[in-house]
Design a protein with these regions (language model features):
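RNA-binding basic/glycine-rich loop and surface signature characteristic of RAMP-family CRISPR effectors
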Residues: 1-303
Length: 303
């Protein structure tokens, strides 16, 4: 899969939404997620990783080494069995697979590592984000939980976000009775008029070397996926979404040169003084304070 990364990375992503719902909250009628105390908008890490997975799947189309483990409506144990078959376990029933794995563990002390390496080698999202593989957990194998080198936090908006409900009507009718009554059907959709969000991420070269084998080629694909994660994911519900900035910090060594928070603090995003209600990206100014960044850390603006 290529050379494993040797440097630690942190990165900051800025993305915005215009007249859309970037991440609906099922606990609030699918309205945009909002911190109830600060009013800041929230987008979960799970939501963003889904976008990245979808982009990888679209670009690579199940190419060897770039399959996606976490897929919509696809049983995870189907992928787990691929690894089992590589070690000669061909059963399809979960109970039989679990028993066979327990026996294999007794006869082959390296079975855990072989299964883990197979999954990491074949599935990009396991290599990047890690995974919990229930089939192996049930068999008490240590490879059931893989911690990935790439981690994301929640995205938060720079300023408070207003959740606005819009009433919509549909000229199409559902039943003949509706046609007789000549009644339109009405519905509602929730949008945020505008929000600029910031998310911070981490990439551990140490975990890449010791666990998943996340490579330089994987890293370049990750940057490409982050930059384009909304480009093939447009929908009426999400409105206009775009990644505006990807700022990458590359350390000179595997364990890094300074704490991550110092690098994140060096990136300032501020609303322009003459703007009261921001409605576009140009209403903000993004600055990087180079004086707060060690000379051994390379800074690159990818967009």
């Amino acid at each position: 899969m290529g050379e494993v990364i040797k440097n630690r990375y942190e990165f900051v992503v800025l993305f915005d939404v215009e007249n859309g719902n970037p991440n609906g909250d099922p606990d609030a009628g699918n309205m945009p997620r909002i911190d109830p105390e600060s009013g800041l908008g929230i987008v979960t890490d799970v939501c963003l990783k889904r976008k990245i997975r979808n982009y990888i799947e679209t670009v690579k189309e199940d190419e060897d080494g770039y399959k996606i483990y976490i897929k919509e409506n696809v049983p995870l144990n189907r992928s787990d069995r691929e690894a089992c078959k590589s070690l000669g376990i061909n059963d399809d029933e979960d109970k039989k697979v679990t028993e066979a794995l327990k026996k294999l563990k007794k006869s082959d002390k390296d079975a855990d590592i072989k299964l883990r390496d197979y999954m990491c080698r074949n599935f990009y999202d396991i290599r990047a984000f890690g995974a919990v593989m229930t089939t192996f957990v049930k068999a008490s194998l240590n490879c059931g939980q893989v911690r990935g080198p790439v981690q994301l936090g929640f995205a938060r908006s720079i300023d408070p976000v207003i959740s606005q409900e819009v009433t919509i009507t549909r000229v199409a009718i559902t039943t003949e009775k509706d046609a007789e009554n000549k009644s339109n059907e009405m519905g509602r959709k929730s949008i945020a008029p505008y929000g600029l969000y910031r998310v911070e991420g981490y990439i551990s070269a140490n975990l890449a070397r010791k666990v998943t084998g996340f490579s330089e080629e994987d890293l370049e694909l990750l940057w490409d996926a982050v930059i384009n994660m909304f480009e093939n994911d447009h929908s009426a519900a999400r409105g206009k979404m775009a990644v505006r900035e990807l700022i990458v910090f590359k350390h000179s060594k595997e364990l890094g040169d300074c704490p991550a928070y110092k690098l994140f603090d060096a990136v300032k995003v501020q609303k322009n003084d003459d703007i009261q209600y921001p409605r576009k990206y140009q209403d903000y100014t993004v600055t990087i304070n180079d004086d707060e960044i060690p000379d051994t850390v390379e800074v690159k603006r990818m967009i």
